[in-house]
Amino acid sequence: VLLSELITRVVGSDKAQLSISREEVQAMVDVGVEEGVFKAKETKAIRSFLKLGEVHAEQIMTPATVVATVREDMTLKDFYESEDEHLHSYSRIPVYDEAEEYIKGYVLRADVLEELSEDHFAQRIGDLIRPILTFRDDEPVSNIWELMLEKKEHISVIIDEYGTMRGIVTMEDVIETMLG
């Protein structure tokens, strides 16, 4: 528990209140390894977690070229009948208006299916849109992690300096990065 609190303080964004450095936490981990407190996988996870501030969104994102997106004026019936297998594979799908590279939010596939079960076939995807967290491609993954946890969101869009989507980062991407 103590180590968990220390790591959280080290990775946290308020640098002015740090009373322990990353190096000190790393030294504690090394001692824990020597004394048999940590297993190899645990050590790797802790070390990866400590490096989250050095990893940026562009390094872990899923590139826009392979992200399934949906236009906000698409009907739920068209969504359901779409032959794009990716629309049926993911739980959260980014939504755009006219230009696919400018994401407005996302839709939960479960929300679409719920509305379809109530025979709302003519309803538009835009009626179900949820806000999406947006980060620049050079944002440290530690900041993304903190905000995703705070907002209880599992998806974020990564943009360039012009607001164009470069890709997405999901909670799963961050966790995989933390676990090494």
What are these regions (language model features)?
Residues 1-10:
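Hydrophobic alpha-helical segments of integral membrane proteins
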Residues 16-180:
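Soluble cytosolic regulatory domains appended to membrane proteins
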Residues 9-17:
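Transmembrane helix-loop junctions in multipass membrane proteins, especially transporters and channels
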